[in-house]
Design a protein with these regions (language model features):
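Extended, histidine- and acidic-residue-enriched regions that form the cofactor-binding/catalytic faces
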Residues: 1-46, 54-204
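Conserved SAM-binding loop
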Residues: 49
């Protein structure tokens, strides 16, 4: 069974930006945990949760844990919400260019999913407002796993502390066509189709 998506999620770090509405962590966790518990109560044993918003993940992990504590035989997969691209792309995106939100990659995703909603004539420029500590790490010559962990640690938890227009990244969003979104999404879909088939073949 494929359920309707939840239209609201956990986006506290974007609170204060025009038009941004977020559920509290407690409410979001409660909603997801209740959905899972009711499904498991009705006899379902497995669930796959897809979330394209990475900000949902900490709360989703808690919701899944709550539901699985109540139903010890339940099985849940939290599907990575990001298209399957190379490790080098991820490093360039998240550390080298700080392209976490509303930048080059997410503009490419909007173009892929809802091209008619993308006003290519009004795409804002890259972000130049991020804190100096983040810029210093971005410009480091040889990036490694420690740098990735440090980037997560030093990143402020509110968009207003990073950007005036919501864009986090230092790369130009108008160059979105260079991102291979179609092939990445095809790989993403194939990965989870194969996962579900293998999962289905396993005995409960």
């Amino acid at each position: 069974i494929v359920f309707s998506p939840l239209q609201l999620g956990y986006s506290f770090n974007h609170a204060g930006m025009p038009g941004t509405i977020s559920l509290s962590a407690e409410i979001f966790i409660d909603i997801v945990a209740n959905i899972l518990r009711q499904l498991f109560q009705q006899g379902w044993k497995r669930a796959v949760i897809f979330s394209g918003h990475n900000g949902n993940w900490p709360a989703l992990r808690v919701a899944v844990q709550i539901a699985r504590e109540a139903y010890i035989d339940a099985q849940v997969v939290l599907a990575d919400g990001y298209p399957r691209m190379s490790d080098e792309h991820r490093k360039n995106r998240f550390v080298r260019n700080f392209d976490y939100h509303a930048g080059l990659t997410e503009t490419a995703l909007v173009s892929y999913f809802a091209k008619d909603l993308l006003d290519t004539e009004s795409i804002p420029p890259a972000n130049q407002d991020m804190p100096d500590a983040i810029k210093k790490l971005m410009n480091k010559k040889d990036l490694d796993e420690i740098d990735t962990v440090l980037m997560n640690a030093i990143t402020p938890q509110h968009t207003q502390a990073l950007s005036t227009n919501g864009i986090w990244g230092a790369n130009d969003p108008s160059l979105f066509e260079q991102i291979p979104v179609r092939s990445a999404m095809e790989s993403y879909v194939d990965f989870y189709v194969q996962l579900i088939k293998r999962w289905d073949a396993l005995e409960l």
